Amino acid sequence: MTDSTSAPDQRAKETGDYRDTVFLPKTDFPMKAGLPQKEPLILAKWLESDLEAQIREARRGRDQFILHDGPPYANGDMHIGHALNHILKDMVVRTQTLKGKDAPYVPGWDCHGLPIEWKVEEQYRKKKLNKDEVPVEEFRAECRAYAQHWVDTQREQLKRLGIGGDWDHPYLTMDYEAEATIVRELLKFAANDMLYRGAKPVMWSPVEKTALAEAEVEYEDIVSTQIDVAFEIVENPFPELVEKAFAVIWTTTPWTIPVNQALAYGSDVEYALIREGGYGYIVAADLVEDTQRRWMPPEPGTVAIGGGDVVHRFKGSELAGRTARHPMHALGGFFARPRPFLAGDFVTTDSGTGLVHMSPDHGEDDFDLCKANGLDPVFAVEGDGKYREDWAWLGGQGSVINLKFNAPDGPICSDLRDAGALLAASADYKHSYPHSWRSKAKVIYRCTPQWFVPMDKVMTHIEPKPPREKRWENEGGAINPHEEDLCAAPTLRQAAMQAIDDTRFVPAKGRNRIGSMVEGRPDWVLSRQRAWGVPITLFVDRKTGQYLNDPLVSDRIVAAVKEAGVDAWSDARAQEYLGDSYNAADYERITDILDVWFDSGCTHAFVLESGRWPALVRHDGGTHSADLYLEGSDQHRGWFQSSLLESCGTRGQAPYKAVLTHGFTMDAKGFKMSKSLGNTISPIDLMRDYGADILRLWALSVDFTEDHRIGKEILAGVADQYRKLRNTFRYLLGALDGFTEEERITDVAAMPELERYMLSLLADLDAKLRQAVDDFDYNAYTRLLADFCNEDLSAFYFDIRKDVLYCDLGPAAPLGTETRRAYRSVLDVLFHALVRYAAPVLVFTSEEVWGTRYPEAGSVHLLEWPDFAALLRHPREGGGPASNDGEKLDSRLRGNDELIEKWAQIRGTRALVTERIEPLRREKTIRSSLEAEVWLPNEAGDVDYEEIFITSTVHQGDWDVKRTENHKCGRCWRHLPEVTADGALCNRCETVLDAQ
């Protein structure tokens, strides 16, 4: 009721119909959200008003918070992982913006690499074209167009999700300027002698015919063939015990036997000689039982050695200086060379036989040990995974990753069996094996000439840093094992480890995860043998094998790439870059391209340092490091690490101050999503069915730091939670209908105790939400907000004060009673605080809420964090850094522990009363709690229990609840002693309706 004239009230008294004398909440804000239809309209309004530019202008000159976007791959529609990742980033940016900071967001995309090449090659194959017959410039143009298509597609999908940012100016790694920056960063490594060309075993994909970075590899459980192979020792060390002695090796990669060059033993390992049929077989003593179990039943053509006796034990060091014959030594040539026994500190007795066959072509330990002993790779396996056609054994017969090639009845095992060297072969060994994360095919270690960044070479161009004394709290201290060396110029590994120790990780376990990876990683393989990527822009002297390191040449190359992109790197322009000082005929132009992880690892240089995005330039001229990198936990071995190594190698520090990681999204049953399982969930479909705000609420409600789930039932629960939050705002809008400044009470001390209590709870919520933002704990943020709305407001405060809201207004109280004025004043504070708190989570709904009350005002996303003193005086403008008065008021409200404890006990009693009333309601003894009369022990004298419990009367005495005999007020429906008959008025209603 907004009309305070007395005529309707007089008629109500005469007719007994008081409906028009009570206040009924009124709002145009509907309970049914209709998000899929409404959100695009709100988004269009934001775009039309250029909201992003308004936000940037409003925060110009403020303290900065810079989140640097890890670029998603420009290939395919947005998936649920993209959605979660970008919602979290948006939450970071919006909460920092809400706190008054200048928090720009520049989205980016990773545009080079093999997956795009594959898709373009597919298009060529459909046209009956061979990619190798197409000019490389044309092929790259197709790749560029393909990437741009998916950039445009994903951009619209992310905008629909409500992600704010500079969408008109994203960064793309295929921009010419970005490609030039990547080249410049590469040439910094070259200038500082931090590149080398070498032949080392690297992860290689025979299907994709290229080297892979560790981050491009995923591990899958497979079943492999395991074999035991006997190598005859050239000079029998135990002639008094056996006629011949054999060293037995075990492997799950039979295809590597053709390039065996040595056998490794453990010097301190105890070995056993098993005698059977006059022959002796050497295995680790601890593995005799396991080995003999594999040897039963015996392979055809071999002796039954599964039951042989151990006739001698000896230390591995006794094998030093001895040699063995390759099982296929009869082929002559390479196979006829003696295979030396070499001591290897990596040899264990965990599995196998305790002896390891060595091939420098196909293993890191193998390569290092063989190289130290003068054994070089033979490069027998080619890029497609086949042995060279001219290789004496198995040349050109099949890919080494082919199951049949390695099978017990395949060519390798068959030939070993014919040679009498195969002791056991079975296709039953289950283990985890590396696969290409793109093609899903198995990868191998293959020794090829590649370009590397050394991890353990001293970087004389980097200033040494003293060890940091302060550690991040509650993270278990430092993990840097190299701190004692940091008084000198560091290696890349040392610099990276120190940078890790200087970085904040959320969750904290991320520190040890990336630290252990960096501590144990090999040199960084930069080169790839593909076409779509940034070239390794080096000229190598054909005589010396050294790459040219000339700043003028480097500058010309960078300038050309900035103007024409990667196509600028061509033979036709080689002399142009070399200038008059060098002859192009004397130099090899490298045609390999860079690892795409180097591309993305350089984005900090392009995005944060170039000045192309002025909002990202530090106002204080300080470090270019981002405040935060935020990606999935798999990026500890991907973007987090490549960015770290690139930045430490060129700048001596990490490109980030903090790293936040999230887990993976599983289906409702906890299974990994995959197209083959048919359990993928499209965020595009979810936005169509539920709306983006539901998807956002889900993402910010789960514990995203761990793997989490999504499914229909889960989303139904989220939708229910959304409805409760929406209903809270609907109630606030309706209850504040007609609220005026004249009605407002700003003196908290003059308010009823319940209002003071609610403001204390709000202040407590505010402090906890601020802490959640500082902790990046958005699960807690959303839970706190929802619990406050559901438990403290809807189920408690709103419920209690409905009577005051509806009935404490009339001709005698045109502004309402003091209690009603205080209630509506607090509701106004709640509205302006909660709409701000909810804005980063429910970006569309909060805009709808704000626009419903203030249709001519600007966007809710221009508001700042609530300042309580300002909120109480002028809630609509009550944002920004807290004033001194606000800080004092916040402190007073938050520090009222006695009041909060008192009301916690009252709420506990209220819950007990509600529990005791419920049986009477179920039995239909009463229809509502207003008809109940309650007896309480230890009733406090200063509390209006009838109001708190929403009951008729409350007496002191033993616990009891009964139906009251009091009559019901015809206006407020309360059953009170002063009501003389049903339909008559209580004292309060008489008073507010009496204008005299």
Task: Explain the meaning of each model-derived region.
Residues 443, 548, 976-979, 993:
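Cys/His-rich microdomains that often coordinate metals
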Residues 175, 396, 401-402, 545-555, ...:
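A broadly conserved sequence feature marking short terminus-proximal activation segments
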Residues 407-433:
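Phosphate/diphosphate-binding loops
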Residues 110, 202, 206, 212-220, ...:
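Acidic, turn-prone loop/beta-hairpin segments
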Residues 13-115, 168, 177-184, 239-271, ...:
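Structured secondary-structure scaffolds
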Residues 973-976, 987-990:
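Cys/His-coordinated zinc-binding microdomains
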Residues 201, 432, 537, 965-968, ...:
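Short metal-coordination and nucleic-acid-contact micro-motifs, chiefly zinc-binding Cys/His arrays
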Residues 467-468, 473-489, 872-898:
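Intrinsic disorder/low-complexity segments
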